[in-house]
Amino acid sequence: MVRKPVVSTISKGGYLQGNVNGRLPSLGNKEPPGQEKVQLKRKVTLLRGVSIIIGTIIGAGIFISPKGVLQNTGSVGMSLTIWTVCGVLSLFGALSYAELGTTIKKSGGHYTYILEVFGPLPAFVRVWVELLIIRPAATAVISLAFGRYILEPFFIQCEIPELAIKLITAVGITVVMVLNSMSVSWSARIQIFLTFCKLTAILIIIVPGVMQLIKGQTQNFKDAFSGRDSSITRLPLAFYYGMYAYAGWFYLNFVTEEVENPEKTIPLAICISMAIVTIGYVLTNVAYFTTINAEELLLSNAVAVTFSERLLGNFSLAVPIFVALSCFGSMNGGVFAVSRLFYVASREGHLPEILSMIHVRKHTPLPAVIVLHPLTMIMLFSGDLDSLLNFLSFARWLFIGLAVAGLIYLRYKCPDMHRPFKVPLFIPALFSFTCLFMVALSLYSDPFSTGIGSVITLTGVPAYYLFIIWDKKPRWFRIMSEKITRTLQIILEVVPEEDKL
């Protein structure tokens, strides 16, 4: 099922085109670097796919403050139950995306699936709010955690200056952008290494926890389902925190066109990753409770540090480094995946054409990567990022739910579509209901923030009609746009992709 772009995304004469040697015609007469076509290569193997999913799901939260679930359940047993249920439901969502990714073999994730099923307007609104607010703010938040924890070993006895955190954060963001601009292979290799660091950090917590259980340290699990008074009405909020902790399983679908043998790799990578993350999350929480009781966990600002100080002695000094590496992995994986979302949206005519162009030698979507840098820097040095993300958290579940509902629609509308991987219908149905529940919960628990988020999201509607539908733009605007694009092509050494889908 292939759509035509909403508008023409690549000029037939106005913009510079790459030649068969993979170079811009205006870059001189040097010997061409090779005969490869200018296009994104399929370099994402099974191992790299697993590292993208695990690397973007596991951030700082499980090490620093996994208390949102416990706070709203009131008992150790119920919190572990919620962690398990959320892992299973996230697996259902991931399996639904595996079917979508092997049926619609295009990059872009939920943007592409919404575009294919529901049309250009909701797809544009999705990418509009993602580009301008959600992704820059989310990248800035995880990057600030990286900056704080990479500096913590140097400021053990005093408070870390806020300016120092932001400066080292800015350096980290720049390194990630440069890395993703220079090489897909190196970005993927570093992601594998960082994922290994994350899993090592989790094992450093789980193994001593298991040893504590063997020694009989089970006092915090006695009467596991009794504890602080907690209303059953707060369980949905605990569920919300749990689902948020697993978010990230959808990122491999953002890079479908770069996955080797996607019909096999995507489902297998998703199943392996979700099994590892779910087991890791549950066992990490079990390990915490072998040493820290519920009240202490709720009071701790860095649970992994508290745990390691009690069991690992001086080795606890290494925990901030592992947390920083975990954050860096989330930064790298997020930028790698989301840049492909912008690339595909540009190819479909929803973003400026320059974002759908590829570097002539490095074969990376350079403009789609670097566009995030100034936007993230603005967010980094601006106001309250957490509030901004809270305003828009409902939008994530709304659009993911729409994408999975689209799977159900395609089952009935296009029953003969080739589906290499097919899930039982109750899986997408249950997950779509879960997403609807998350949106309803946002409206119920915080109507003010959700209302602000709705207004911000809906600004994409007039933007769609102004920038996409209105085709009688002034001549001076079209000329200026073309000149800017040509200039950026020459500076960045990028051209339209050859043999696009």
Swiss-Prot record:
Keywords of this entry: Amino-acid transport, Cell membrane, Cell projection, Disulfide bond, Glycoprotein, Membrane, Phosphoprotein, Transmembrane, Transmembrane helix, Transport
Compartments where found: Cell membrane; Cell projection, Microvillus membrane
Entry's transmembrane regions: 44-64, 75-95, 131-150, 164-179, 194-210, 235-255, 266-286, 318-338, 365-385, 388-408, 423-443, 450-470
Binding locations of L-glutamate: 135, 244
Keyword Cytoplasm listed: no
Short name of one Pfam family: AA_permease_2
GO molecular function ontology, one term from the record: cystine:glutamate antiporter activity
Extracellular side of membrane: 65-74, 151-163, 211-234, 287-317, 386-387, 444-449
Glycosylation sites: 314
Positions bearing Phosphoserine: 26
Residue intervals annotated with topology Cytoplasmic: 1-43, 96-101, 117-130, 180-193, 256-265, 339-364, 409-422, 471-501
Recorded catalytic activity of this chain's protein: L-cystine(out) + L-glutamate(in) = L-cystine(in) + L-glutamate(out); an L-alpha-amino acid(in) + L-kynurenine(out) = an L-alpha-amino acid(out) + L-kynurenine(in); N-acetyl-L-cysteine(out) + L-glutamate(in) = N-acetyl-L-cysteine(in) + L-glutamate(out)
Record-level GO BP terms: L-cystine transport; L-glutamate transmembrane transport; L-kynurenine transmembrane transport; negative regulation of ferroptosis
Summary of the function given for this chain in its UniProt record: Heterodimer with SLC3A2, that functions as an antiporter by mediating the exchange of extracellular anionic L-cystine and intracellular L-glutamate across the cellular plasma membrane. Provides L-cystine for the maintenance of the redox balance between extracellular L-cystine and L-cysteine and for the maintenance of the intracellular levels of glutathione that is essential for cells protection from oxidative stress.
Protein name per its UniProtKB record: Cystine/glutamate transporter
